[in-house]
Amino acid sequence: MLILISPAKTLDYQSPLTTTRYTLPELLDNSQQLIHEARKLTPPQISTLMRISDKLAGINAARFHDWQPDFTPANARQAILAFKGDVYTGLQAETFSEDDFDFAQQHLRMLSGLYGVLRPLDLMQPYRLEMGIRLENARGKDLYQFWGDIITNKLNEALAAQGDNVVINLAADEYFKSVKPKKLNAEIIKPVFLDEKNGKFKIISFYAKKARGLMSRFIIENRLTKPEQLTGFNSEGYFFDEDSSSNGELVFKRYEQR
């Protein structure tokens, strides 16, 4: 089983590391090409392209400038410990044991605009380059055209290595669009998390993101390898709703706290 999650905009390069082990990203040649394109952008262009403040644009222009392909623990950090958004609040990788990291390294992948696919222990230097950004490059008008089949091929390699054919899609749509489902040698299962609001169940972004992290943690902690085992997920009040689910979509609901 291969779990897919999105990266995060918020990064943490200060907290103590839970593990000293690391690997190197497998698609750095591609990352280097994107950095080459990104370095052509001025801070105002970055601000417009990414819809971010002038201050953040300046920070990210500096990141593009400082990025260099010789990754070491001195200038980079394991991806699963560097990302700090809502998904990662649910995942809580900073509390993983070495055995948890081992399982995650085999079964979890982070999709990334700059790095394509990251394994949990892959070192990464700080960046911001969301998959949906229209950064023109030698291969096309945006990052989807840049990555083409590369991400899908890398996921197929990971599936073949574990002798499995199930992908658990916990990534945002913006990121899963970089995967070609018809070329993926896997059945795709998508967990959906609905929260009750005023008597109706719907996707509430903040809660859904955290729930994707909670589900990832549930799979890793319990060493789950079969999709039917996911129905036992009950973290923070969620429960499986079989009637609302289908073959490719597992629906989990949570009642409003009263």
Curated annotation (Swiss-Prot):
Cellular component terms (Gene Ontology): cytosol
Protein family (similarity comment): Belongs to the UPF0246 family.
UniProt-listed InterPro entries: YaaA
Species of provenance: Shigella flexneri serotype 5b (strain 8401)
Domain of life from the UniProt record: Bacteria
GN (gene name): yaaA
NCBIfam families xref list: PRK02101.1-1 (NF002541), PRK02101.1-3 (NF002542)
UniProt GO BP: response to hydroperoxide
HAMAP family xrefs: UPF0246
Name of this chain's protein: UPF0246 protein YaaA
